[in-house]
């Protein structure tokens, strides 16, 4: 899945407010459009990490329809994909612990989008769930 979400940037007298229709709890602002864009990515991954923490599915992004897309980082996307794969497989974190031969703390770190993890460890975890990681690079705006 591609974790790029349409954002609404609304200019207001005191700055720019950013909201995400697909992730309503992700809201931020900045004094300038540039600052709002920087904060938007942080607000998005913070809100999505709560979905992981609460064991809820990650919302699917809707079509951009002329709105600017805000993406999570490649590492964050891989962690969100792992979370989605765990939910789709209907397994618990403890089952993944046994399959990977890791301790619970290590698996929790692998799942946490706000923690750094080696990409190889994430690829191994996804392979255990019948998934593989592909990376694509696209032109920037």
What are these model-derived regions, one by one?
Residues 4, 15, 69, 130-132:
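Broad gene-expression machinery/nucleic-acid interaction feature
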Residues 17, 57, 132-134:
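Residues at or immediately flanking beta-strands
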Residues 23-24, 53-57, 128:
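Hydrophobic/basic alpha-helical segments enriched in Actinobacteria
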Residues 28, 32, 92, 121:
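Ser/Thr-centric signal marking residues that sit
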Residues 120-136:
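DNA major-groove recognition helix of helix-turn-helix/homeodomain DNA-binding modules
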């Amino acid at each position: 899945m591609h974790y790029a979400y349409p954002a609404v940037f609304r200019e207001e007298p005191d700055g720019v407010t950013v909201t995400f229709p697909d992730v309503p709890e992700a809201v931020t602002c900045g004094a300038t459009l540039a600052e709002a864009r920087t904060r938007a990515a942080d607000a998005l991954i913070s809100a999505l990490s709560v979905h992981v923490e609460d064991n809820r599915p990650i919302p699917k992004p809707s079509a951009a329809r002329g709105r600017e897309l805000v993406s999570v980082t490649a590492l964050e996307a891989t962690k969100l994909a792992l979370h989605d794969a765990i939910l789709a497989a209907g397994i618990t974190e403890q089952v993944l612990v046994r399959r990977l031969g890791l301790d619970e703390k290590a698996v929790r770190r692998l799942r946490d989008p706000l923690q750094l993890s080696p990409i190889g460890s994430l690829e191994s975890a996804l392979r255990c769930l019948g998934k593989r990681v592909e990376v694509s690079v696209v032109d920037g705006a």
